[in-house]
């Protein structure tokens, strides 16, 4: 499963939050740990993945244990479905066991051990480790090591499940193909190496996982209602196939489909369908932006049963130090992303030639050219009104040719609308020297230039058009 972020797995400094129980919740500010890179030795024997695929060595490129799990389990499941009647009790237990094993991954392997998003008492650790073993996705240490590398090197060749290599590679390919340990990005797992329970799980994972994934569901269904075979095929094998591919969807779908409301510097996305099948891991863009937050979303209606489970566990004292990212920083991310979207939209629109790119025209030249061209001067900017049809009549427009119409345009005759100012900007052709001097705008000297968007373009908001005068000039009253 992936939990993406360019900031990668991070240790964190914490601050008490005013939200909820301060003794249980902490705000975290991630700090990327300093982890030395592996040094590549060009004289070292080539890994199989550094050698071309041939008819003689193709089998050496594959991870056969993973191949048996990924391809063998679905075939066993299909055989079981066609040869074993499904009992209602077994179906109910299989669904519950699916949720339990999924929770072992999401609340345990992922948020507890990979990201240290909260701390857990030993009973909760044992409970989650057993559920994670039932998912048969590797030991706590192995899973967390790859996941931390994924966060640190998201979307690069050092990312173990790099989605840039395609959907199928991110989904299952990275497990089918034997990984080159010299090419996978390094991650810091010293905290896991010093945890006796995690290392016990790592050393004895295969027998523990075999029991939890296959033997326990068979015994449970068999001893309670005599359905050993159904317990094995449905609560064991079929459940495991669904758990695996639900988890794999976080590596693949959650990096390809969905929204990016918090950060778009990497491929992580929020995807509701993935959240449904993974107990809340589908809010992946949030997770990659704020990886040490025990939540995968802010709002109550964002589907994240893992968050609810952790919170309830904290009420019973089984979980504590629940990390939450400062809300102010989360809101900043939202605003910045929305600004990016607006900037991309703005970049598609015609805002007229930027003032600094306009030529400088002498006032005498403006007067001379106005004899043959429909030029209008407003606030020091020359506009060529060729082809424009004035809604108030062409007579009003012609009366402004060759003149400074600043006052008339800004309330002297009519206080033109925001749309009129925007439209006028598309007709500008020069700025004048003399008269209303605005050459200074071209260099910015002595003037406060408008803010720029992320594309480097000036942001022109309502009422900030260069042709608008504040406050508008009052029209002359009739005597």
Swiss-Prot record:
Q: Which residues bind Fe cation 2?
A: 150, 255, 284, 288
In this chain the Cytochrome b5 heme-binding domain maps to 357-433
Q: Which residues bind Fe cation 1?
A: 110, 115, 147, 151, 287
Membrane topology classification? Multi-pass membrane protein
Identify the residues that bind heme.
Answer: 390, 416
- Cross-referenced SUPFAM superfamilies: Cytochrome b5-like heme/steroid binding domain
> InterPro entries attached here?
Acyl-CoA_deSatase_haem/ster-bd, Acyl-CoA_DS, Cyt_B5-like_heme/steroid-bd, Cyt_B5-like_heme/steroid_sf, FA_desaturase_dom, FADS-1_CS
Q: Where in the cell is it found?
A: Membrane
In what ranges is there compositional bias, type Low complexity? 1-18
**Which PANTHER family does the entry mention?**
ACYL-COA DESATURASE (PTHR11351), DESATURASE 1, ISOFORM A-RELATED (PTHR11351:SF31)
The name on file for this protein is: Probable acyl-CoA desaturase
Question: What species does this protein belong to?
Answer: Schizosaccharomyces pombe (strain 972 / ATCC 24843)
